C-alpha cells in the first residue's frame, strides 16, 4: 500500500474530530451523538421500540439503504476510471426501475422468475442508457456531463408521465406498489419480536464489487479502461480503441446504476414518486471520490455515509443534536477529502520532481 493511499482514512478521522468539536460547541455530548448514530443504524444495541422494531430492524433497514448506495458508487467509479464523469446515475436508476416495474413488478410471475428478471432488466436498461451516453461522447464528442444531465430530465419526466397516466395510486399519488414476488428481498417477515427485511440486493452488490475488482485488475478491458482514463492520447498511440473503450465503460457504469435502481425502488422502496430523482445517484459521486476511486474503498465510504444518514434521526431524538448536523458532518468529510485529493496530487508531483 502506498503512503498516500492512507490519506482518505486520515481525512475521515480528521472530519470526525472536527465533528466532535462542533457538537461540543453546541453544548451536546459528541461521543453520545456518535454512539446514537451507530444505534440508529442498527450497529449498536438499543431498546426495542414500537411494534416489532429494534436493533435488528434498524440493521436490516441500514442494509437496504447501503445496497443502492454501494452500487451507485460503483457506477461512478467505473466511469471515473475511464476518465468520464457519470452524473446521470439517478436517471439511469429510475429508467431501470421503471422498466423493471412495468414489465415485471405489476405481473403475476412467481418470485423464482420475477426476482432474477428484475435484476437482469435493471442491468440491461442501465447499460443501454449508459451506452447511449458513451456513444454520444464517441460519435459526436458530446460531453458526458451534458448528455447525462439531459438524460436525467428525459427519464424523469417520461417516467412521471406514464406513472401519472397509467400507474398512479390515487391515495399516495406515487406509482402503485409492486407485487411482493418482484421485491428484491431475501427475508421479509416477523421473527420473534422483530421485523426482518433482508435485501437480496446486498448479495448483488457484493457480486458487483467482486466483479469490478476482477475487471479492473485482471482483464484486458480493465487495463484499457484505466489506460484511457489516464491518457486517452497515449492509449490511442498504444493501439487501444478509445471510443469503443469509453462506450463499454459507460455501459458497465450504466449497468451498475441500473442495479442500484432496482435495488432502490424495488427493494428499499416499493414504488416511485413522480418527478423525483433519488439523491443516491448524486451522493454516490462524493462516496466514490471519498473511497479513493477504489472498489474496496467505496465499501467503507458507502458504509460511513449510510451510517451517518440512517442514524441521524435517532441521534437527533436521543442526544438532542439536530439531524441537520449529520448532513453537515457529511459535508465536512467530503470537503476535507477533497483537500486530501489535493495533498495526494502534490505528493505525486513532489516524488516526480525529486
Predicted regions located by residue number:
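Cytosolic-side transmembrane-helix boundaries in multi-pass membrane proteins
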Residues: 1-14, 20-24, 31, 230, ...
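Alpha-helical transmembrane segments of multi-pass membrane proteins, especially transporters
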Residues: 7-8, 61, 65, 89-97, ...
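Interfacial/capping segments of alpha-helical transmembrane domains
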Residues: 20-43, 166-178
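Transmembrane alpha-helical segments in multi-pass inner-membrane proteins
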Residues: 251-257, 263-331
